[in-house]
Amino acid sequence: MLEKEHPLRQLFWEVTLRCNLACRHCGSDCRKEAAVPDMPLEHFLPVLDDVATITEPNKVMINTVGGEPLVREDIVECGRAITDRGFRWGFVTNGVLLTKDLLKQLLDAGLRSIAVSLDGLEEEHNWLRGNSYHGAMNAITLLTKTKNLVWDVITCVNQRNFSSLQLLKEQLIAAGVKKWRIFTIFPQGRAKLNPELFLTPQQFRQLMEFIATTRNNGEINLSYSCEGFLGDYEGKVRNHIFRCDAGTMIASVLANGDISGCMSIRSQYAQGNIYHDRFSDVWNNRFEKMRNRRWMKKDQCARCKAWDWCAGGPFHLRGDNGEMLHCNYLTLCSAK
């Protein structure tokens, strides 16, 4: 159905490729100085005006992402302009630059949601993200005292923090965190250079058990990310059955102007560029490969009994030639 109907519900804006950290797992390979300059706000606003011609603004969430969005000195101005046009907005942050005063300014600018990255206990987090643990925890403390804001903590599970997830869960609960989201690494950017970032099949199955058990206990609202179909764990580790919404309900505008599906999809799958194309034209008339995925039914997918539910998996796990880079369903099958 989404081949014909593709209601835009989330639009990611890559506001910067600059970052105050240099995380081992960064899929964008972000640094303090970026090769691509920040997209000026005045270049993005016409995109929002165009989006408003094809859907009601209040139905679309604008996710400002990076890099680290808070390195932009005009991030409050960006948020206010998004709000003034009737859109909701939020962002993902490492938390280091978030202060009480800045949070108030962001809320006054209409901020609706924040996700803070915390990747383990202090030693594990700092191994992955440099000496930033206390900055992340300070941000989380600020958010626990904030009303009328949707927020959660995001954790990248890897070899270093896998064995301490129970302790991390207890720490988050004690800190007042209500929502926790877990994801695992895929081979992109700096991440593909470090084998310690990847779980074994047995560890991945244990992770699914940990999430399912935690959800059943009701101690904290924990969910697994959208990293593909999970077989028997569907319905147990997140609130919905897997579906890749890239190009059907989710779009992105990258720092260089490229228009794509979700932020994690490889650059060669870009469908246009805001400096050459109208966003609405691209959204309505392109994205064929993301909306009609029958071309994915090849190689291991052609023989897979889960095809009817999985439909080729998440688009960001497809390589340069459309090949499957990783399949969590097959990983779980191999761990039985």
What do the predicted segments below correspond to?
Residues 1-7, 264-336:
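Flexible mid-to-C-terminal extensions adjoining Fe-S/redox cofactors in radical SAM and related proteins
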Residues 1-112:
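Conserved alpha-helical substructure of the radical SAM core
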Residues 12, 16, 20, 241, ...:
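Residues immediately within or flanking Cys/His clusters that coordinate Zn2+
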Residues 19, 257, 279:
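Conserved, mostly hydrophobic/aromatic
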Residues 20, 24-27, 245, 302-305, ...:
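Cys/His/Pro-rich metal-binding microdomains
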Residues 34-35, 39, 108-113, 117-119, ...:
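Radical SAM enzyme [4Fe-4S]-AdoMet core and its adjacent flexible, acidic
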Residues 62-64, 91, 116, 153, ...:
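Buried hydrophobic side chains on well-structured beta-strands
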